[in-house]
UniProtKB/Swiss-Prot annotation:
The lineage of its organism: Bacteria, Pseudomonadati, Pseudomonadota, Betaproteobacteria, Burkholderiales. It comes from Burkholderia cenocepacia (strain HI2424). This is Dihydroorotate dehydrogenase (quinone). It is found in: Cell membrane. The gene is pyrD. It is an enzyme of class 1 (oxidoreductase). Gene3D superfamilies: Aldolase class I.
């Protein structure tokens, strides 16, 4: 039902400030989940099970982190047919993020620019929200560092968040690729990444012993990487036996949107313009890691054909964000059906 109404809703939402529309939508989805009205949103999406990271996904099309930073609308979002939900990014302490305005639509390019800056209510509130959700499907919890934590002490923030979210996560994503937290992408460097992943894997094993379950770790990387950087990241993922990698986050490049309104705004660009760059990183990364580190492909998916292209490049699963904002819930079913068709062909 909601899928058919979304074009009308979008017309109204797109007349609003982008962040105001975002919050309004989240509040509505959160209320629907809390009151049991989520069933009215339910989308008819066929099952297309896939096992990745030792987890069985209802279908291979998930929601990317960033839409629901605090995990406040999990049940409402789950009703839209996603095979898995990822929420966050969350940091140890609450923080307001960057000053507004900080989210901009580029409709001519079917894109968004954001410089949100990990705005969230902190990991303690995040965990309460996750615990309150009734959703029992695959839930990824995405963690980051506070803006005022020196980059040299970033590992402390990730380790703290990992310990707090671990009991409630199907998998945990380590976000080191947002362009909106100063120096964060330095953690993608070979030495920094090696040290961070070593600490996280050690913590993961100790938490697995404590809780009696191994929760997989996924690393989220940027599209703005050269061939050598992709190779180094691939080698590091293999060496530390990281369970998955999410490719990719937003881009700093403006090559595809030059001259458009808001194109010069600072922040990460997402949507259709990042599709090719994301796919290229997926292809190169898959050449390095093969099937030993499953890739979750995200960036610029606006159709079932786009979703299949991610899998053809080497991804095992896909996630939606900006395409979902522009296309609505109908995109989820379209992607699942396209992937199922190609798989059976």
């Amino acid at each position: 039902m909601f899928s058919s109404l979304y074009p009308l809703a979008r017309a109204s939402l797109f007349k609003m400030d982008a962040e105001d529309a975002h919050h309004l939508t989240l509040r509505a989805l959160g209320a629907a989940g809390r009151t049991g009205l989520a069933c009215a949103l339910s989308a008819r999406v066929p099952d297309a099970p896939r096992t990745v990271m030792g987890l069985t996904f209802r279908n291979p099309v998930g929601l990317a982190a960033g839409l629901d930073k605090d995990g406040a609308a999990i049940d409402g979002l789950a009703a839209l047919g996603f095979g898995f939900i990822e929420v966050g990014t969350v940091t140890p302490r609450p923080q307001p993020g960057n000053p507004r305005p900080r989210m901009f639509r580029l409709p001519q390019a079917e894109a968004l620019i954001n410089r949100m800056g990990f705005n969230n209510h902190g990991v303690d509130q995040f965990v309460k929200n996750v615990q309150a959700a009734r959703y029992r499907g695959i839930l990824g919890l995405n963690i980051g560092k506070n803006a005022d934590t020196p980059i040299e002490r970033a590992a402390e923030d990730y380790l703290y968040c990992l310990e707090r979210v671990y009991p409630f996560a199907s998998y945990v994503t380590i976000n080191i690729s947002s362009p909106n937290t100063k120096n964060l992408r330095q953690l993608q460097g070979a030495g920094e990444l090696d040290a961070l992943l070593a600490a996280l894997k050690d913590k993961q094993q100790r938490l697995a012993d404590l809780h009696g379950k191994l929760v997989p770790l996924a690393l989220k990387i940027a599209p703005d990487l050269d061939d050598e950087q992709v190779k180094e990241i691939g080698d590091t993922l293999l060496r530390h036996k990281i369970e998955a990698v999410i490719a990719t986050n937003t881009t700093l490049s403006r090559a595809a949107v030059q001259g458009l309104p808001h194109a010069d705004e600072a922040g990460g660009l997402s949507g259709r313009p990042v599709f090719d760059a994301s796919n290229e990183v997926i292809r190169k990364l898959h050449a390095e890691v093969g099937n030993d580190v499953p890739i979750i492909g995200v960036g610029g998916i606006f159709s079932g054909e786009d979703a299949h292209a991610k899998l053809a490049a080497g991804a095992a699963l896909v996630q939606l964000y900006t395409g979902f904002i522009y296309r609505g819930p109908a995109l989820v079913s379209e992607c699942v059906k396209a992937i199922a068709r190609e798989r059976s062909a």
